[in-house]
């Protein structure tokens, strides 16, 4: 009888239909960090930091940059005759200048506040160059022979294309005066200069007087310049120097020039047609036939990642720069390998015993076994809900760090090294803060994502438990054993949430009572065996005590045994 009960119990356990809830497991080696754990293996993750670039300058949104070639920014603005190839360039997405161009200010000198002009002009996307004063429109001065061997063109002496070097005419240099009225309706950049001869004799030869001045005035500007005559070392064959100045003339504003010598007069000015988020890069990189939406100093970036680690000096639609090379955001659940052996008869197990490598198109799902066989399927509803949440999380990470910041690195010359150092220090501080915030944000989000996956699996398990009610037994490992027959149609109802426990309530009740009865009967037989064993053991102990007493009594004469025949 005991053997029959035991086999019946085994038969019931093996043959019962079963459904389990679990999650994906795969061969991924992706590791992420959380706020409390490092190197957590997950089934999938997203790299948030872009490190790849084109290694060249590219057009932005179809608009080409302008390369100054062998010309410097100052040489371009003043019109170095060796920069004539740039004359037709009036529109660009950004400007590229070599670190050490050969064609700068050919006659030795400086462009005052060049760094500020670079910064202003880096945002200019288009200008219109026009003749502000004709070369011979300055009256009784000579405007045609102001050339120098320092600015040669085609083997002949020349001068800056956008300027006119006015000298005496027939031994006289009267006071000259001209006014420009800005009626363009846009800002106009105008440049002028003053010549500083090396000797008084040179000054007298050129301007026929011992002293001279240049006065410039407008509604917002008023300065008077005089030549600084001094002996200097020769540069490019010249002991003299030239200093150039500039002014942005607003619409409706007028600017007046007055001089009696040493005047470098403006000939062409720049009407600023379009201003935007431009940039001036200093780099040896070439401009290639490529397109990008984000350009850095060392190459273009085409990415949809949230951050980049290419270079902080950028233009375009760029992700935020951080000083870390990798930030991985977990998307899938923890990658816990499945237990190799599930026991007899191809047994299945739930999420407590590890993930499922066979789960396709989902993070969570069901595995079942019945008379029709075994099967596995993803729960698309809970998976899609999790995908939507995590996708939204990835898309919103940058929005949490939406502080506007633009680096001005490399837009200052060596003369302004202190400004460079201060700018770099500010840039470094801001980037450090952003990088720390990004790392902390990813750690927190990874922790929340893994908790989300754990919660989703448990919620799915709880959903099935509430659906099945007393029609199945919760095995405690993520699986349920049915008290009724559950074919594939029945299994599918459990998966899609249309299972009706009342339909199988009566069958489940009968089978549950039978199983519980078998357990109870089996338990009764065990108790019976234990009772018999206890009785026999007690009898043996009692007999041993009686025999011991008799031996003791006989040995001391208290008891006598007489045998009669």
UniProtKB/Swiss-Prot annotation:
Leader peptide range in chain numbering: 1-16
Cytoplasmic compartment segments: 553-565
PTM: Palmitoylated.
Statement: the UniProt record of this protein carries the keyword Transferase: no
InterPro entries per UniProt: Capsid_hemagglutn, Hemagglutn_HA1_a/b_dom_sf, Hemagglutn_influenz_A, Hemagglutn_influenz_A/B
Keywords, sorted A to Z: Clathrin- and caveolin-independent endocytosis of virus by host, Clathrin-mediated endocytosis of virus by host, Disulfide bond, Fusion of virus membrane with host endosomal membrane, Fusion of virus membrane with host membrane, Glycoprotein, Hemagglutinin, Host cell membrane, Host membrane, Host-virus interaction, Lipoprotein, Membrane, Palmitate, Signal, Transmembrane, Transmembrane helix, Viral attachment to host cell, Viral envelope protein, Viral penetration into host cytoplasm, Virion, Virus endocytosis by host, Virus entry into host cell
Membrane-crossing residue ranges in chain numbering: 532-552
GO biological process, one term: viral budding from plasma membrane
SS bonds (residue pairs): 20-479, 58-290, 71-83, 106-151, 294-318, 486-490
GO MF annotation list: host cell surface receptor binding
Regions of this protein lying in the Extracellular compartment: 17-531
Biological function: Binds to sialic acid-containing receptors on the cell surface, bringing about the attachment of the virus particle to the cell. This attachment induces virion internalization of about two third of the virus particles through clathrin-dependent endocytosis and about one third through a clathrin- and caveolin-independent pathway. Plays a major role in the determination of host range restriction and virulence. Class I viral fusion protein.
Entry similarity comment: Belongs to the influenza viruses hemagglutinin family.
UniProt subunit comment: Homotrimer of disulfide-linked HA1-HA2.
Misc. comment: Major glycoprotein, comprises over 80% of the envelope proteins present in virus particle. The extent of infection into host organism is determined by HA. Influenza viruses bud from the apical surface of polarized epithelial cells (e.g. bronchial epithelial cells) into lumen of lungs and are therefore usually pneumotropic. The reason is that HA is cleaved by tryptase clara which is restricted to lungs. However, HAs of H5 and H7 pantropic avian viruses subtypes can be cleaved by furin and subtilisin-type enzymes, allowing the virus to grow in other organs than lungs.
UniProt name for this protein: Hemagglutinin
